[in-house]
Amino acid sequence: MATICNHHVLSCMHGLRENRLAQQPALERAGINPAVMENRSQRVHTDQVARLFKTVQETLNDEFMGFTQNSCKVGLFATMAELVSHCSTLGELLEKAVNFYNLVSDDIPMRLSRSRGNAVLSFKMAKPELDPEHFMAEFWLVIWHRFPRWYIGKPIRLRGPHFTF
């Protein structure tokens, strides 16, 4: 059973707390017992955490879950996925996806560079103070590693993620 530590569960609800919205309904909708949150060492099943992330996004109507100055309407990632669905290479997919997000949002500027057969995908939170526990930065990295890997049906080995924190 794949699990995720409570830190990520608590961190993802930052936007709910900032907007003074109740967290318990989101936990319950995701199938997470709110009592579990009292124990920092407790782990939560990945399916429940995925439901919680989606619930937070839907509650806030913000795919960036309140970690950026401007919201990112729910459905934008799906629109990007549709846009890149006809790409024939990983490079083309990443290029179109980066251009798309840079066009629609200034909150997480992205850059794709290539050198000697390697690609470097970089991004920086425009207002890192809105992501105090670096949840969104880490979540964004996971998304941009897993989505292309799923799309091409092959593993993509990270050579070395680098963080500014």
Residues covered by each model-derived region:
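N-terminal low-complexity or simple alpha-helical regulatory segments
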Residues: 1-121, 136, 157-160
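DNA-contacting interfaces and partner/effector-binding or oligomerization modules
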Residues: 109-165
